[in-house]
Amino acid sequence: VYTDLEFELIKEDIKICKSLGVDGIVSGVLKPDNSIDIERTQTLIELSKPLPFTFHRAFDLIEDQEAALKQLIALGAQRILTSGGETSAPEAQHQLKKLVETSNDRIIILAGGGIKSNNINKLLKTGCKEFHMTANAIVKSPAAKAPIMLNASTIIPEQNYKASNLEEIINVIHELDTFFSKHD
């Protein structure tokens, strides 16, 4: 759900991204009842062309995901980034499989959220062929412990930061390569 000003900014962001040569657009709009805002989402999809459009994880807030999937196909979206309506994709394997089956190759189900090397094989059984992961880890900074918190974060102390976990990324790529080499 976006205000009119926020929606105008999203449209401007899409124009800027296109001018910069990005490979695709990830966005989407819901109504206050957590259904797809058809009119605004259609506007974003049209504005994104010829780039592929991915409807983001707002999809996970939608109650009737199968109906929403069909709406997004009709609107011309190419992909849905989803954890199947749960906090993480591994918690929603059954729903992800259902979405892949319902999509019937008309739209890509891009599983995302909580994906790691120790669960990617289970997610491959859903039929998903694309995955989104952060694969980050908290890195302890060599800086001295700050006497006060400047970032108001209770999750990551100020002297630490998140960084990509190369080992985890390599492990997931290995699992994917192994799976797809057996299923080609």
Residue ranges and their predicted role:
Residues V1-I10, A144-I155:
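An active-site metal/cofactor-coordinating segment within enzyme catalytic domains
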Residues I16-P32, A77-P90, I115, T126-M149:
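Glycine-rich phosphate-binding active-site loops on the catalytic face of alpha/beta enzymes
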Residues L44-P90:
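Histidine/lysine/aspartate-rich catalytic loop segments that bind and position anionic ligands
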Residues V1-T41:
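Glycine/small-residue-rich loop that forms an oxyanion/phosphate-binding "nest" at active or ligand-binding sites
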Residues V1, I36-R57, E91-S117, A152-K182:
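Alpha-helix-loop-beta-strand connector modules within alpha/beta enzyme cores
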Residues V1-I16, D60-L75, K97-A111, I115-M133:
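Catalytic cores of alpha/beta
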Residues S35-I36, E63-D64, P90, I120, ...:
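Short secondary-structure boundary/hinge segments and terminal tails
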Residues L5, G28-P32, H56-D60, S83-T87, ...:
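Conserved short-loop catalytic and cofactor-binding motifs
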